[in-house]
């Protein structure tokens, strides 16, 4: 009764709405139906951007290979929408997915997703990041709207340490072979190619969102050369686009394992 009374006043209504949006959004229990009877939860206010890119703009539609997927690794899973989208395309074939995500906010949502009865038998969640395992952990900058990164944008940003996963942890958590590894952790694409040869050698396709400022230092051409050295060839790519919020370019490439 008190809440109903307070919402009559614009000031209190705005304060309550603000608190729900930023602190209790998941309590609203919002989910959106996608294809073939699957649903995508919207656990936080900033999840709509990722949902829009994948389900409305069909960001991955024209770049993924035309195969049936059995086992994948989703590196930089965000809220798990890539995996949900891929599963919704093949409703009669269960998709086993290892969701790797460094963000504290996203990992809470992914853990809830993995408990969902529709996904509980096929999703595994791992809180961690891709990097040089010799360093054990790295700084991570939490930002809303898919802007989290291992790179600092300003000296005022706060950070926290995230565990770097090694190859054996990934292989034991989700045994190979893999039909696809998708990597979308800003700046970690180079580390994936340099420090996880046993993992990617047992993968049929690599789907990488590249960033021209990756830690290798020489942009997309360096990534392409590294893929060639690892016996992968580029089979599809998106057009490069100017990055949002910083200088540089971004794009996606699909690479096929020639030894697979």
Question: How does the language model describe each region?
Answer:
Residues 1-260:
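Phosphate/nucleotide-binding beta-alpha loop and adjacent structural elements of enzyme active sites
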